[in-house]
Regions:
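N-terminal secretory signal peptides
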Residues: 1-8
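Beta/alpha (TIM)-barrel catalytic core signal, keyed to glycine-rich beta->alpha loops juxtaposed to Asp/Glu
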Residues: 154-321
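Short, acidic/polar
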Residues: 67-80, 127-140, 191-198, 270
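Acidic (Asp/Glu)-rich catalytic clusters
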Residues: 44-46, 103-112, 138-142, 200-201
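Active-site groove signature of glycoside hydrolases
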Residues: 141-156
Length: 321
């Protein structure tokens, strides 16, 4: 197969980038379609958000005061996100030192005002405990305002508790401490999806965050449609299914027909599938290298697959398992 049509893995991208530094000419299709990263509106405000952001679980959990190598690399990841057209960074108190790392890097870089910053609060606990946790997040992030506060892994055992927590978040929103509120959920189960639909219909959420990848597609059945119907913005995490998808395609070239939607790497292939669903506001893969961050952002450029092509993509990935 001609190199200009074969597609590249992320490791290939790094190798070819090194070759470029040595003066070699790279095949043009390695690069994504030109132009700005696609943006979509937050339904309740019509604020435009770039469709690719950055998740911080595990990757930003380190001591930024002592690990200078990781600090420099993550700093470059953030710079790449912002300079290449992204905005949203998602974190949580349960992500170890991730909030502290962001609280170190964002002010130092002078980019806090360019970032759409989202964090989370526990799904259970007293009003005082939840308030204390949110206040601690502000302290760790070294900011007095957040763009999005989310109830983390919302539960369905106690409807009154969830309502009380959302009321607390609404108070924070009314006071101007956060601009949007929402919930996250990570169970890939139909029963949980049904409850999420009920929650969106009952409560006027600004955002919902769910797991969604080509390996976990249960939210396609009802959740994403309900989000669109209720005016709820959607963030999707684990878009590579914790690298399961990259494992499935290891050693394989991106199929020629991926050129029809401007995907030149597997990362773009996987993300463009998700972004083709217009209910998805922003995907938030973790990125520990600037090259990966740039590749993720390139998924938001160029064409997206249509419904028939998405079915073909699923059939192809399924055939590899």
């Amino acid at each position: 197969m001609n190199d200009q049509r074969k597609g590249y893995s992320r490791r290939d991208v790094l190798k070819l980038a090194a070759a470029a530094g040595a003066g070699m000419v790279l095949p043009t299709p390695l690069f994504a379609a030109s132009g700005p990263v696609l943006s979509r509106p937050v339904p309740r405000s019509r604020e435009m958000l770039p469709v690719v952001g950055l998740g911080t679980a595990i990757i930003f959990d380190f001591d930024s005061s002592s690990d200078t190598a990781k600090r420099a690399e993550r700093r470059t990841v953030i710079r790449t996100l912002l300079d290449e057209g992204g905005r949203l960074i998602d974190t949580a108190p349960s992500y170890g030192r991730a909030e502290l790392t962001l609280g170190d890097l964002l002010p130092e870089m002078g980019v806090r005002d360019r970032v759409f910053l989202a964090t989370k609060v526990r799904a259970t606990g007293s009003r005082d405990a939840c308030t204390a946790e949110m206040q601690e997040s502000l302290k760790r992030l070294r900011t007095n305002k957040l763009d999005l506060m989310q109830i983390h892994n919302v539960g369905f055992r106690d409807r009154n508790e969830t309502t009380a927590q959302l009321d607390l978040l609404r108070e924070w929103k009314a006071s101007g401490v956060c601009r949007y509120i929402g919930v996250t959920h990570s169970q890939d189960q139909q029963s949980a999806n049904d409850r999420l639909v009920d929650l969106m219909q009952r409560e006027k959420l600004d955002f919902l965050q769910v797991n969604y990848s080509m390996a976990e597609r249960s939210v396609e059945q009802r959740v994403l449609a309900a989000a669109a119907d209720t005016g709820t913005a959607v963030l999707t995490n684990l878009p590579f299914a914790r690298a399961k998808l990259f494992g499935a395609v290891r050693g394989k070239a991106v199929p020629d027909w991926a050129a029809e939607f401007d995907a030149t790497t597997w990362g773009q292939f996987f993300l463009k599938y998700l972004l083709a669903n217009e209910a998805v506001t922003c995907v938030i893969p973790g990125s520990d290298k600037p090259e990966y961050m740039a590749d993720n952002l390139n998924a938001g450029r160029g064409r997206l697959p249509n419904a028939a092509m998405r079915r073909k993509m699923v059939d192809y990935i399924t055939s590899l398992s």
